[in-house]
Curated annotation (Swiss-Prot):
Biased composition (Low complexity): 346-355, 517-557
GO biological process: mitochondrial genome maintenance; mitochondrion organization; mitochondrion-endoplasmic reticulum membrane tethering; phospholipid transport
Protein name per Swiss-Prot or TrEMBL: Mitochondrial distribution and morphology protein 34
Annotated gene: mdm34
Domain of life: Eukaryota
CDD domains: SMP_Mdm34 (cd21673)
PANTHER family to which the protein is assigned, alphabetical: MITOCHONDRIAL DISTRIBUTION AND MORPHOLOGY PROTEIN 34
Family: Belongs to the MDM34 family.
Comp. bias regions, Polar residues: 301-313, 384-403, 435-446, 457-499
Keyword Acetylation: no
Ranges where the SMP-LTD domain occurs: 1-195
Region (Disordered): 293-313, 346-566, 596-615
Amino acid sequence: MAFNFNWSPLTADAGFYERARDLLTTALNKSPKPPIIVDDIFVTELNLGSVPPDLEILEIGDLAEDRFRGIFKMCYSGDAFLTLATRVQANPLNTYISAKPSFTSPEPLTASSSLTIPLQITLSEIKLSAFIILVFSKQKGLTIVFRNDPLESLKVSSTFDSIQFVRDYLQKTIEMKLRDLIMDELPAIIHRLSLQLWCPDQVPKEDEEAKEESDAAINPLATPPLDAVDAHGHRLDPAEISSLSLDGGPETQSLFSQKNLEKMDALASAHRTSSLLTPNILEVVFRAWAGQSDKPDATATPASTPNLHRTSSYQGSVHTYTFSDNSSQASGHALSRPTLVSMGSATTGLSLGSGRHSKAGRKKKMRVVNLRSKTAVSEPVSEIGSTSSQAGDSHTEASTRTPMSEPVIPTTIREVPEDDLAASQSKVRFRPPTDATTSARASESSGPRAAVPSVPVTAQPSRATSSQEHVYTRQPSMFPSSPAPQTSAQEMPPSYSSRVSEKAESTASIYADAKGQQQQFQQQQQQQQQQQQQQQQQQQQQQQQQQQQQQQQQQQQWGRAGPQPDMSSVILEQAWITKIAGEIARRVYDEKNRNPAFWEDSHQHDIPPPAYEPR
């Protein structure tokens, strides 16, 4: 089976090209054009070339004398070309503003002026490859359907080829536009051409162009208003009104109501602000009046809108809260808490919006405790004995007179831990003095050892330990690194031995007082513990008695009312639970006896690791 396709009649017919150009021009101007194109697109040249497309028959579905249906594979790489002419906008700002609403555009004066440039585009070197479904009928013409995108490549030449980015932009844009044209518009164009060639009777008659009905301009002066006056308030005759024109000047404008003109102007410009995306603003009423005088209640004085503003305080206020703790002073440790500073900026966020709630008027309570009083001037104490005799009085005065926001210097003897004593090199540990040692020291004071100069000793009784050891701290600055030169007893003053004996006696009295205070404290603690134990025992006895009484009452009630049906099940459950608990305890005991090493290891794992001790 052979087919003969004659390409020469199409290329030689001049009327064919004219009809094809008209159809292509209509198709190019049918769809909306981009804003950069400011004029219609005209097809100036169209040439199919001398090289026909290559057709390969893949399938024939229907074949007769007057109809044909088949699937073809088309490949075209000929010398056809197409030339288009139009005008483009060279000012991009004009293109941007023309595509945006007027109420959102900046509206420049001269920068957005139009600048149009003629453009000529030539499409050549067209390469097509596609699968085509072709249906031919003498009654219905030729129908072509592309199953895929037929355009492979295309060369675009224009008047802006010297500018690289413009050439690339045109190449990309025209290729995209031409693909849509071939897939959508080209089959319709070919169908209309086939009807003109083979079926002239089936060509649809074009609708007669409707005559453009120009709207007649309405002259408002044709029906002049009653009692018309000019700008100066003088009445006008009907003859004078007919001689006026719309562009006559202020005399013509005075014939109309200024109020109505203002309303019409506001109505015409209302679309500039009536946006659908207007945000909802609370406590705001939008009104469509042109001005304050146009309202019906214009005679009344307008209500003043309250000024809504927020005030924030930026002045900071400092408050000092002091606390006192007698127990801490009794132990010799000064209690010092950091001051609480409340700045104004910290409470600004809490104060904002306080008027929104019903409980907003409630103010924050501020309690200021003033523990400051007249500072007591403590008399200088020269000897240790005087400080020990006035220890109780000075302790109470310091706790009441000295504010806790300042450093407190206790006059009582401070207790020092033994760990700190072992670490310091300036502290000496020795046994507490007894009567024998004090007398021996008093007798040795006259010997050669008494030649050492006197050193002030500060007694600091330590915590109660098993050995009842006490620590006495000497000032390290009083001990020079080099040994002091020994002097004979004859060079020392005669009153030196008496001073040493007095100091030894005072030291012994201090130790005795401290020991007595410690014993009293221990006795008080023991008495408190005994009282607590007695109270706990009494409470336990009372609880047991109450439980016994309740059980007796329940038994009496059960005896009177008889056993309830549910009580038997409760008793059985309690007995069963007791039996199970005993069985579990017995098994745990047996398991521990079988493998005691495992349980000992598990207990050892619960012991925490030793604390870190630096070497």
